[in-house]
Amino acid sequence: MSVEEFDRLAEPDELSYELDEGELVVMTKPRPLHNRIVISLTFELQAFVKSNPVGEVFNSDNFYVLSPNTKRAPDVSFLRDERAKQIDPDVDIPGAPDLAVEVLLPNDTVSAMRRKIRQYFAAGAQIVWVVYPETREVEVWREPTRAEIILQEADLLEAPDLLPGFSLRIGTLFG
């Protein structure tokens, strides 16, 4: 299935979908813990960007067209200012976000998450953060083949190249 075919699909139900290399994927409905983490991180990033206008923060309502047959909607994403100013607000965002954040759901598989990470980087992402609610950890990816570091509750989440000055203690995400 192509991106164009995906866009023409009627949504007869309350399910959310992504397009994964031509395959329609039903997205699992998030649970409260997932939503709390997403809201917390979105709030922290938005507050930072409001005080430091370096780009724009998006939620999972926004699709990124990563290839002609792949559309993803990361839980949280960030585009640097120069890219954010160029997007057409009426269409999906071409390419990957500069920063993609995925919060793992209980039925997500490691292989499916690794596939998403590879897709983000192939389309131009600079950083991917993968949040693991059960272990209260965050993986920081700067390349598609391996996580650079795994952060735990007392560690600081930072992205100096994209968000100079942003710093968030990992434990803050988990309440």
Predicted regions: what is each one?
Residues 1-175:
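Gly/Pro/Ser/Thr-rich low-complexity, intrinsically disordered segments predominantly at protein N-termini
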